[in-house]
A protein has these predicted regions:
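A charged, aromatic-enriched C-terminal amphipathic alpha-helix characteristic of glycosyltransferases
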Residues: 412-416, 426-461
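Nucleotide-sugar-dependent
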Residues: 285, 347-356, 361-383, 391-400
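Nucleotide-activated donor-binding/catalytic signature segment of Leloir-type glycosyltransferases, i.e.
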Residues: 305-308, 315-317, 322-355
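Membrane-proximal helix-turn-helix segments that form the acceptor-binding/catalytic region
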Residues: 66, 153, 160-164, 171, ...
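Helix-loop-beta element that forms the nucleotide-linked donor phosphate-binding surface
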Residues: 204-205, 210-211, 216-253
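Conserved donor-binding/catalytic core segment of Leloir-type glycosyltransferases
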Residues: 258-285, 291-295, 314
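N-terminal subdomain of nucleotide-sugar transferases
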Residues: 2-99
Length: 461
């Protein structure tokens, strides 16, 4: 009997010891306060920023990192390191990148039957990588700033890691994960309902919340019932998005792009208009709207409105539906339905993308907003470069970003988009009016928005 009790005690003590040994180290504010006395080496705060996605394609989270570092904080940026990050990120000694391991290639499949098998394995792999990064690969931090969506499994893992490491959790709401899932499955699907419950449950563990619109803040307060501070933090362009006022500089840059080679003569003659659209090639951006409008524009330019200028549409971005649309565009070109329009896709460096926006005639946003209360960052960047915008406007938060007829115009169909293109390209004075409004909007900058809201919360302003 005694030997049995001793054995049980041994196993229990071993299990407890192992558990304590495996617990992640905790943030100690007293130790941090002692370090802060030596201002020459100690940061004002320490922050982990988590992006369950490609860091290079998450501009807002990169801007958070740069602002924290500018204020004297230390940042550990956690996410997939697939695309080129902002050059100031990689050169800043106060910012380090902890790259998440990509999914093993054998788990990546388009086969629906294999997806049912590999799907749970991919989620399990993701959970392990997230937990390992948040709990063991990084030092404990005062704050953990998490991008949402994606919410699964991010919010649960982040909540647990924050609790165990004595870290304050902040959720930066870009949209709602369950509304994006509903685009594919429908509002009543069990997975959508579970996703909504999950999101509403785990977000309650956050110390504070940032969100991209006032409308989103209202939903978080009134429908999610959150009592922690909810701070609307509107997107604003980073400093490298600036207008180019010299037309010869604009023209010179456009001529340097490989994408303009087929229409260089038209560009030099001034009979070409360049439009730019940045898309994620996903279900919440109906690219067929733009294709249809451009086909109809080409037809008008060939028939009843021969004075319309030719158009070069430069499309940037990566995503799952890209190849599908490229095949569709190729067929339309072969059929002669885009004779007055040239469509080119590209992926540019951060600086070249900013210069492209500053040199183009119009920006196009196809973002339809699954929730109705998020806003497209791409429009913010366009305004930063002084580029007027035509965008899908059938959602609640659109007026928080675009002032109709002042810095851009909204549309709700390909026909309305076509009407705007024809009107603006037939009447240069109207285009110049909204360009002036966009350049005025470019004066509103990220740091001006960030400092009194996020900077104040983090103790950096």
């Amino acid at each position: 009997m005694i030997e049995s009790l001793i054995s049980v005690a041994f196993y229990i003590s071993t299990a407890v010891t192992l558990l304590l040994f495996l617990l992640p180290s905790r943030y100690d504010p007293r130790r941090f306060d002692r370090l802060k006395k030596d201002a020459s080496i100690a940061p004002k705060t320490t922050t982990q920023i988590l992006v369950l996605g490609d860091i290079g394609r998450s501009p807002r989270m990169q801007y958070h990192a740069l602002s924290i570092a500018r204020g004297g904080g230390q940042v550990d940026l956690i996410g997939y390191n697939e695309s080129e990050v902002h050059p100031d990120i990689s050169s800043n000694p106060r910012i380090s990148i902890t790259a998440l391991a990509p999914h093993p290639t054998f788990l990546q499949t388009s086969n629906k039957l294999l997806f049912l098998l590999f799907g749970p394995l991919k989620v399990a792999f993701q959970i392990v990588c997230l937990w390992w990064a948040l709990a063991y690969r990084t030092e404990p931090a005062q704050w953990l700033l998490v991008q949402n969506p994606p919410s699964i499994p991010t919010l649960a893992i982040a909540s647990m890691a924050s609790f165990l490491r004595h870290t304050k959790l902040i959720i930066d709401w870009h949209n709602f994960g369950y509304t994006i899932l509903a685009l594919k499955l429908g509002d009543r699907h069990p997975l959508v309902r579970f996703s909504k419950w999950y999101e509403k449950s785990f977000c309650r563990y956050a110390t504070a919340h940032f969100c991209v619109t006032e409308a989103m803040a209202s939903i978080l307060k009134n429908h999610f019932g959150l009592t922690a501070p909810i701070l609307p933090l509107h997107d604003r362009p980073a400093s490298h998005f600036q207008p180019i006022f010299d037309q010869s500089e604009q023209k010179s840059f456009l001529e340097s792009l490989p994408e303009t080679a087929p229409v260089k003569d038209l560009l030099q003659a001034g009979s070409l208009r360049v439009i730019v659209s940045s898309t994620s090639w996903t279900a919440d951006e109906d690219f067929s709207l733009l294709i249809d409008a451009l086909c109809r524009y080409s037809n008008l330019a060939n028939t009843s409105k021969p004075a319309l200028p030719a158009v070069l549409a430069i499309i940037t971005g990566k995503g799952p539906q890209k190849e599908m649309y490229l095949k569709q565009i190729s067929k339309l070109q072969e059929a002669g339905k885009l004779s007055k329009v040239t469509i080119r896709t590209t992926w540019l460096t951060t600086d070249d993308y900013a210069r492209l926006l500053a040199s183009a005639s119009l920006g196009i946003s196809l973002h339809t907003s699954s929730s109705g209360v998020d806003l497209p960052m791409k429009v913010v960047d366009m305004f930063g470069a002084g580029l007027p915008v035509l965008g899908w406007d059938r959602f609640q938060a659109w007026p928080e970003l675009v002032t109709e007829g002042v810095n851009g115009m909204g549309f709700g169909s390909s026909g309305e988009l076509l009407d705007h293109l024809v009107d603006l390209f037939e009447n240069p004075s109207k285009l110049e009016k909204i360009r002036t409004g966009a350049r005025k909007e470019s004066n509103r900058r990220w740091n001006d928005e960030w400092d009194p809201i996020a900077g104040k919360l983090l103790g950096l302003a």
